[in-house]
Structure formats: structure tokens, C-alpha cells
Amino acid sequence: MSSGFEFQLASYTTMPVTLLETLYSMRKKIFSDRLEWKVRVSHAFEFDEYDNAATTYLVGSWNGVPLAGLRLINTCDPYMLEGPFRSFFDCPAPKNAAMAESSRFFVDTARARSLGILHAPLTEMLLFSMHNHAALSGLQSIITVVSKAMARIVRKSGWEHHVLSTGEASPGETVLLLEMPVTADNHQRLLGNIALRQPVTDDLLRWPIALGVSGSAPQACMHSAA
């Protein structure tokens, strides 16, 4: 029996317009309104130059109601670590065909609470879906810029990672550059933690369900050194 949860994958060019607009609207509510990040907002939407044809999106929903999302960009393409995040760290931004950057990761806990499903392992399911997609796409790792609190959440979910660098987004605001390896062990730990709170179904094992061709898989990379 279905749990009502579904995680879907689509590229910028193949995602249905209504779903893309919903995603941008949720990002505006979470990153601009709630967290007060200095992000680009236009009307009711949050989006920037990294929302483009090179971008892949993951969206999690319950009974058709979107609750969570993230975006992935292969590091062969322009991505945030070599753009707005470049001043945070001393290390160079990797250019590696087998590595993608995750950004705009969110779970709408307020919406989940209103639906009575806050107990569900939404963060773990979103991470599991990203790991599944990365493994099936031939990616070896995901990099991401996070707070210390988010790094702890990622590790608690079961995804072991390495801290490539520590920096500051602003005075006193520490951020970490994580490399999250795509491995069988991480897959099993993520799945095991989900199983503690949510039945593991055949549908879950197949997440994310592809809505179109993604753009974060390995490709020819002009600079392949990490």
C-alpha cells in the first residue's frame, strides 16, 4: 500500500511549469521569508542564474502536495561554489565530471506539520533520493555548502561525508564545504534510518521517479581535476 510519498526528478527544461513555479514559490517562502537569506526574489518566486538548462531538480511530495526539494548542477557547468560562494573558502572550486553540487535543499516543516506528517523522515528520504539518482547517473560524490547544524543533520541521516573546507558566509556565520561520497554503505545507512520511521516499499527503493532527462550526470569536463 502506498504511503502517499513520492520523490520526482526533472531537468529545468522538462519539469512541468506549474511544478517549477510551485518549487520557486516554496523556495521564496523558506529562504527569503523564513530564513531571511539574501536571495533574488521576483514577485512570489525565488530563482537565480543557476536555475537553467544545466539544472536538475528533486521534489518530494505527499499525496501530490510538494514538501521538499533541492537542485543539482554538475561541477563541469557553472555552479554556486565558483560563483556567490567562492569568497567563503580558500580552496579552489572542483571541476569534476563525476561530481555535482547540491543547493537550495529544503524541507517545508510547516507544511508537513499542517498535514500531520511531521513524523515522516522527509530529510532522509530527500537525501536517499539524491543518493539514488547520483548512483544511477554515475556520480561519485555530491558537494554542498551547509551550516554546522545542517552538516550534523546529514550525518545523522546516515550519509557520511568529508569536510573539504571551513569558511564564513558572513562575520560569525560558519559554513562548511562538504563532499558526500556516493557509496553502497551510505545507501544502506540512509535506507536503514528511513526504515526506523517509514515502511520501505518497492516504490521508495525506485525513487526518484524521472519526469524527464536530468542534467547532472557525468559529461565531458574541460577541467577534470578535483
Curated annotation (Swiss-Prot):
Keywords: Autoinducer synthesis, Quorum sensing, S-adenosyl-L-methionine, Transferase. PROSITE patterns: AUTOINDUCER_SYNTH_1, AUTOINDUCER_SYNTH_2. SUPFAM superfamilies: Acyl-CoA N-acyltransferases (Nat). It catalyses: a fatty acyl-[ACP] + S-adenosyl-L-methionine = an N-acyl-L-homoserine lactone + S-methyl-5'-thioadenosine + holo-[ACP] + H(+). GO terms for molecular function: N-acyl homoserine lactone synthase activity. One of its GO terms (biological process) is signal transduction. Gene3D superfamilies: 3.40.630.30. Its EC number is 2.3.1.184. It comes from the Bacteria. It holds the Pfam family Autoind_synth. Belongs to the autoinducer synthase family. Required for the synthesis of OHHL (N-(3-oxohexanoyl)-L-homoserine lactone), an autoinducer molecule. PANTHER family: ACYL-HOMOSERINE-LACTONE SYNTHASE, ISOVALERYL-HOMOSERINE LACTONE SYNTHASE. This is Acyl-homoserine-lactone synthase. It comes from Pseudomonas amygdali pv. tabaci (Pseudomonas syringae pv. tabaci).
